UniProtKB/Swiss-Prot annotation:
Residues 371-380, 408-465 have a biased composition (Polar residues). It comes from Xylella fastidiosa (strain Temecula1 / ATCC 700964). This is Ribosomal large subunit pseudouridine synthase B. Residues 299-476 are annotated as: Disordered. Pfam families: PseudoU_synth_2 (PF00849), S4 (PF01479). Its EC number is 5.4.99.22. Residues 27-96 form the S4 RNA-binding domain.
Length: 476
């Protein structure tokens, strides 16, 4: 036999090759936090130095690195470092007035993040900010590195605005000398600022319209520049950020996503890597309570056979679980429509204490029974003597009609107390109609009489006419 190995057969096998573990990513903590959009790197480094961030339960140190799977705590929230594999996304949002560019506003004002598309496993990061009265273009992205690069002053990204200005007091329009001063530079509270470009695009009787360009993103920079010269800004709208323009067809409060080709062009313009490598980001932790491994300890030397489950007595545990017991009367299986209200829904101990107590009696709902002495009750149940209330020989037959077939009925020729004769069928014959209390007001009226027939009172019947209709009594 030769020692040459046999070629592999095409048979199936349950054996699996040992999978090679993917290398864990490791990055600086402040970079991971910035990638998640929690702030600038400089501000995050300051927070790390102040001991406001924890990694795996320990206070983080400046310059430390984190790996995928590490738990990071910041501002009372917990995150887990994980790899970011999805490509960057950029959103164009036409911001209306009245919205603030923040996630949570202490004053309860509406924010721009309330109307944005929902993301899974990522979050929108605002590229710059617009104050509550400024409208127009607002860029948001899922790439924290791209957002920081576009906001950094060293990138010198142009921001273009359209502004409506009221001229200083005593002047009809904004003078050219004032515009030249704004392009040279004006001293503000946080340093010198200027407009890179100022273009007059129109005017009215009381306002002037301008198109201005700045390369910095200071807080309310455009408004403060005009206010430093005695002008008042009444309208301010951003129309361009770098190479991204606000689409004309995009309405206020609506958003649209930037194509991937333009996103890659932005990264190239900012000298970022074309193909974004794997990076670490933060994913929020969903609060879940995981129970520890169960351990049962039994003391065999104890005569009472006490057991302890995870350092807790099983007797105590059963006492705690007893509160979840639901005692009820076992009923037959119905269609599931009726719910019994007399079952016990208290704990076992409370039910044992209440065992001697009777069930609670509930008052009937919507009780429409009439009170005693009500006239309606009297009229409904009062039947004059000698008036039958049902067919002959019926079990519910009333007085004067014979309640039982073996009993003899009264003489049909005799008159009753109301002046009517008793017939075999009380409602079939005309002179045997029942009288009710309401008829006592007109005792001579018989609604079932025939024309010309005398009533018991000796008065002519009021029925008759063309259609033999019932009529009320007529008096001369």
């Amino acid at each position: 036999m030769s020692d040459t190995p046999k070629p592999p057969s095409n048979t199936l096998s349950l054996k699996r090759e040992t999978a090679t573990e993917a290398p864990k990513l490791e990055e600086r903590l402040h970079k991971v936090l910035a990638q998640a959009g929690l702030g600038s790197r400089r501000a995050l480094e300051q927070r790390i130095s102040n001991g406001l961030i924890k990694v795996n339960g320990d206070i983080a140190q400046l310059g430390m690195s984190v790996k995928s799977g590490d738990k990071i705590e910041l501002d009372g929230r917990s995150f887990v470092a994980s790899a970011l594999t999805e490509p960057a996304r950029v959103l164009i949002y036409n911001k209306p007035e009245g919205e603030v560019t923040t996630r949570e506003d202490p004053e309860g004002r509406p924010t721009v993040f309330e109307t944005l598309p929902v993301l899974k496993g990522a979050r929108w990061i605002a590229i710059g900010r617009l104050d509550i009265n400024t409208t127009g273009l607002l860029l948001l992205t899922t790439d924290g590195e791209l957002a920081n690069a576009m906001m950094h002053p060293s990138s010198e990204i142009e921001r273009e605005y359209v502004v409506r200005v009221r001229s200083p007091e005593g002047e009809e329009h904004v003078q050219d000398e004032l515009l030249e001063q704004l392009t040279r530079g004006v001293m503000l509270e946080d340093g010198t600022a200027k407009f890179d470009t100022i273009e007059r695009i129109g005017n009215t009787d009381s306002h002037d319209w301008f198109r201005v360009v700045v390369k910095e993103g200071r807080n309310r920079e455009v408004r403060r520049l005009w206010e430093s010269q005695g002008c008042q800004v009444s309208r301010l709208k951003r129309t361009r950020y770098g190479s991204v323009l606000l689409p004309r067809e995009l309405l206020r409060g609506q958003s649209t996503e930037l194509p991937k080709t333009q996103v890659e062009a932005l990264r190239t313009q900012l000298k970022l890597e074309k193909d974004m490598p794997l990076a670490l980001t933060l994913q929020p932790v969903i609060g879940q309570r995981r129970s520890a491994k169960a351990t049962l300890h039994v003391n065999r030397n104890d005569n009472n056979k006490h057991a302890y489950h995870n350092n807790h007595s099983t007797a105590d545990e059963s006492r705690e679980l007893r509160r979840f017991d639901t005692l009820r009367d076992d009923r037959g299986r119905g269609q599931g429509k009726h719910h019994f209200k007399d079952r016990l829904t208290v704990s076992g101990e409370a039910a044992a204490k209440q065992a001697h107590k009777p069930f609670k009696q509930y008052k009937p709902k919507n009780d429409r029974s009439l009170s005693e002495g009500s006239p309606a009750t009297f009229q409904s149940w009062y039947v004059p003597e000698g008036v039958s209330t049902g067919p002959r020989n019926h079990r519910n037959a009333g007085a004067g009609n014979g309640a039982h077939p073996n009993k003899k009925s009264p003489n049909p020729n005799t008159r009753n107390t109301q002046g009517q004769q008793t017939r075999k069928s009380p409602y079939k014959y005309t002179n045997n109609a029942p009288n009710f209390p309401s008829d006592h007001a007109t005792p001579t009226f018989n609604p079932y009489g025939n024309p010309g027939q005398k009533t018991g009172a000796g008065q002519p019947n009021n029925s008759g006419g063309k259609y033999n209709r019932n009529r009320g009594p007529r008096y001369p």
